[in-house]
């Protein structure tokens, strides 16, 4: 984040995260100065605040950002690529060694956000999980609720 701010890039942040990120950007890095500490326009971030659906770009690579707003995912958002029905689910999807969900509640909250947004998802991926069919994830959520 500090590098992006130093370069003057727009940074899309969830509204709830702004106070934390403002402090992070304002923090001095004098012992080992980073790019933000060295730049002349430091501490002036180009925040793009996400508090609801936010569209970025156009055409087949257009993205839509949606806050998750769950009990465990309140500070995360998902990224949807409508042309390919592809969903990036942030840091919510990870499988155990047995193929089950590491934390079913996280994916349950993503499924709720997908329903609220009324989007059609075919494939989902996340920080710790490669692409997999959305139908498979829904089945894993359902299975975890029966246990």
Cite the ranges covered by each PLM segment.
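Metallo-beta-lactamase
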Residues: 5-7, 16-144
């Amino acid at each position: 984040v500090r590098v992006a701010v130093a370069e003057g890039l727009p940074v899309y942040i969830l509204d709830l995260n702004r106070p934390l990120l403002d402090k992070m950007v304002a923090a001095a890095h004098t012992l080992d100065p980073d790019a933000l500490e060295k730049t002349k326009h430091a501490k002036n971030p180009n925040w793009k605040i996400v508090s609801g659906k936010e569209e970025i770009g156009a055409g087949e690579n257009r993205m839509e950002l949606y806050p998750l707003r769950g009990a465990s995912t309140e500070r995360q958002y998902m990224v949807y690529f409508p042309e390919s029905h592809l969903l990036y689910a942030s840091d919510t999807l990870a499988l155990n060694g047995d193929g089950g969900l590491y934390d079913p509640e996280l994916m349950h909250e993503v499924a709720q956000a997908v329903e609220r947004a009324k989007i059609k998802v075919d494939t989902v991926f996340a920080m710790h999980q490669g692409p997999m069919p959305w139908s498979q994830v829904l089945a894993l959520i359902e299975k975890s609720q029966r246990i």
